[in-house]
Amino acid sequence: MKKEFMKKIYKSITLVATILSLSSCGNDWLDRKPADGIPSEDAITNYNDALTARTGMYDGIQGNSNSTSYYGARMFYYGDVRAEDMQARTQGMRSSSCYEMRYTVDDAPNMWNIPYNVVRRANRLIQAINEKKVTDATEAQIGKIYSEALVVRALVHFDLVRIYGMPYTADNGASLGVPVILKPLERNDLPSRNTVAEVYTQVIRDLTDAINSGYLAKDKTQGYINEWAAKALLTRVYLTKGDNENALKVAEDIITNSPYKLWTNEEYVAAWSKISGVHSNEMLFEIAITGSTDWTDREGIAYLYNEDGYADVIATKKFLDLLNEDPKDVRLGVFLAPTTKDFQKLYGTNTVFLNKYPADGLSDLRYNNVPLLRLSEVYLNAAEAAAKLGNQNDKAVKYLDAIVKRANPANTVQGTIVTVDRVLLERRKELIGEGHRFFDAMRNNETIVRYTSKEDQGWQQALKEEVRSFNRDFYKTLLPIPQNEIDANPAMKDQQNIGY
């Protein structure tokens, strides 16, 4: 299988031209330099160059103190504050635009350039290996880097299509998604938007190629993508696409065969610290931050969510009321009450601050790792997919019960019919602060209700009526394509999202 995979990757570059729609003018995003430690397009000529480019690719996912437009912070709070369980504070300057949904074509959170720059970095690695520029390493070493780059490319395209395209389940992927980019673009390359379905096809192809290659590590690899992380992403993709049979199948493979296990009830609160002895048990993939040269500093998600940082984002009263329905739910332990007088005046003793990104042994929360894929999500993916299949209630009960009983061993869903709504409720409780809720609601066509009157407003600020309660038909559930990209690319001239 591995040799067949290597033959395939050397041939795959010839397929690129059939996927891209190209024109002949300059493009704004192409003005960015690679910035991945490799100074030119021709510089990946040996294995050490490839390792350096690989590091740059992973660094791009995380970002740094000057660039948190992806998983450094924005991808998380984009999925949190646009729903009903987390909110920007009145003074939340960084997340308030997403929370209030007050963006326009000329003033919107930019989730375009940085992710596509990560695609560029992945494609440079893929192209160099396709062109046999890396020959001083074993087939396994080369195949591993190549496969990781495929997974990264899939991750970014999947995120982009969820941000700028309608949910696949809305119209079976017929609407416009984002450009599928499979090679480093030149200045005369101007891709148009592919359909949502075409993007998903490529994402699934990249993930399955990487998994089937046999080159991805099967053991735990902190800070790097392994086979189980790729499969965890694949089950998320299948679930979002509405392919519940495959979502369940892949999730069960991870649960049964991977070296990962759920944190116990006793471990749960402390396990969020990366220096706890059990932290890695659940973390299938996270960006490891080892020092101040590769951190997101005060612009990272840990600093934004913590009272000792910017305290930019807090839990809503609506969510805390939900979680407090069970006073023995262990997840209450990852929320903290204010300790400063100013915040106590605003929120009293309410535990509004999420502590899933705590300080490590250096007592500095800026060193906290950036988690992307966790085993609890895989269990909930399995439960949701099983519930949707209709004839798999035993499995829906099994996987949901693992999360419910972990939260409070006295609780169970045994002996019940597990509904999709019940799974989604548990997802809200378990995955808060990890960037999921908004996307969960969109793919399931749920209505997000933040508040409808002053009586249920809690401590949320006054919002325009249109963003107090909405579903995926509301045009601002999609971000606008940045206007400078539209202006620079004639191929996308008439492809702006509806409403903008």
Predicted regions and their residues:
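TPR-repeat structural position
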Residues: 200, 244, 392-393
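Inward-facing hydrophobic residues that define packing positions of alpha-helical scaffold repeats
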Residues: 54, 119-122, 200, 207, ...
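Short, surface-exposed recognition loops and adjoining beta-strand edges that mediate ligand/DNA contacts
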Residues: 41, 68-88, 160, 165-174, ...
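Extended ligand-binding clefts on enzyme/binding-domain cores
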Residues: 47, 52, 198, 241-242, ...
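Membrane-proximal, proline-rich intrinsically disordered regions
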Residues: 25-76, 272, 305, 309-310, ...
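Bacterial Sec-dependent N-terminal signal peptides
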Residues: 1-4, 8, 18-48, 203, ...
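Conserved, well-structured interaction surfaces
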Residues: 91-164, 194, 212-216, 365-370, ...
